[in-house]
Design a protein with these regions (language model features):
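Glycine-centered hinge/linker elements that transmit conformational signals in sensory
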Residues: 42-73
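Beta->alpha turn/N-cap motifs
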Residues: 14, 78, 95-100, 130-132
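Short helix-initiation/N-cap motifs at beta->coil->alpha
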Residues: 71-86
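Short, hydrophobic alpha-helical packing/hinge segments within bilobed ligand-binding/sensory domains
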Residues: 1, 81-85, 99, 146, ...
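Extracytoplasmic/periplasmic substrate-recognition and gating elements
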Residues: 66, 104-168, 215, 224
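Paired acidic/hydrophobic, glycine-rich loop segments that form the ligand-binding mouth/hinge
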Residues: 12, 91-96, 112
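Conserved C-terminal helix/tail region of periplasmic/extracytoplasmic solute-binding proteins
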Residues: 5, 194-245
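Extracytoplasmic/periplasmic solute-binding protein
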Residues: 1-46, 61, 90
């Protein structure tokens, strides 16, 4: 409300491609209902028409209905909304660390990040931290060499190089992080303090359910009065998709 009263849009999001909206569902569902329920929903063992899911959507609707998001979010891709922040017309963005790659060097010092706000202190903390991995084909002609190469890619030395060059958090716990930028150290502390690390909506559920879910999130963003209809439709899709698994 303070930001709005000063002519600043509190939150930007570009939902032209649906995945930025999915991040909002991930976090609100984990903050309201806990990461265990969220992941079970992703795995198809909980139902979308469960009152707990509706409760998460109601928190989301409150943010949208109060005008805390940028107007016409569906007309923007995720990078299109960055100028609003650079011009100090907007304040916050739920986005991954990679967003800093699109911020001019001279502006990077102006930006910081914080944990998605806790809604219920009694609920375990879940965080979205999509992890990129390396894989070898099951029928690789040289499986032992492939395993050795994968071990090399996951080694302390290579993980250090990747972290320094790409500015991404390493997965190898032996990497010396003492010389890392403060933002990276802060990110690692944030994840270390989490009770569960999720991978993101479209990675944690099936591709078919992810497609239906993200389309539903876009529809909800445009009309928050349709929660019951949207969740009923998602539940029908969940039942069909996971019955076929």
């Amino acid at each position: 409300e303070t930001l709005k009263s000063n002519g600043v849009t509190p939150i930007v999001s570009g939902t032209k491609n649906a995945w930025p909206a999915a991040a909002w569902f991930d976090y609100l569902n984990m903050r309201v209902n806990g990461p265990e329920f969220h992941i079970n929903l992703m795995l198809g063992t909980e139902k979308y028409d469960d009152p707990r899911v509706k409760k998460a959507f109601e928190y989301w609707a409150e943010l949208l209905d109060n005008g805390y998001f940028i107007e016409n979010a569906a007309s923007y891709d995720w990078q299109d909304v960055l100028p609003f922040m650079l011009q100090e017309k907007a304040a916050m963005y739920l986005m991954g660390q990679f967003v800093m790659d699109s911020i001019p060097e001279e502006n990077k010092a102006d930006y910081d990040f914080f944990r998605f706000p806790i809604i219920d202190p009694a609920v375990p903390i879940g965080e979205d931290a999509p992890t990129d991995g390396y894989f070898a084909a099951a029928n690789a002609p040289h499986p032992e060499a492939a395993k050795q190469f994968l071990a090399f890619l996951g080694s302390k030395e290579v993980q250090t190089y990747v972290a320094e060059e790409l500015k991404r958090l390493p997965t190898n716990t032996e990497v010396d992080t003492s010389s890392f930028p403060e933002a990276s150290k802060k990110g690692m502390e944030l994840l270390a303090g989490a009770d569960y690390i999720a991978q993101f909506f479209d990675r944690d559920t099936t591709p078919e359910m992810a497609e239906k879910g993200m389309a539903a999130f876009q529809a909800f963003w445009n009309d928050t009065t349709q929660i019951d209809t949207i969740l009923a439709d998602l539940e029908k899709e969940r039942a069909l998709i996971f019955a076929a698994e």
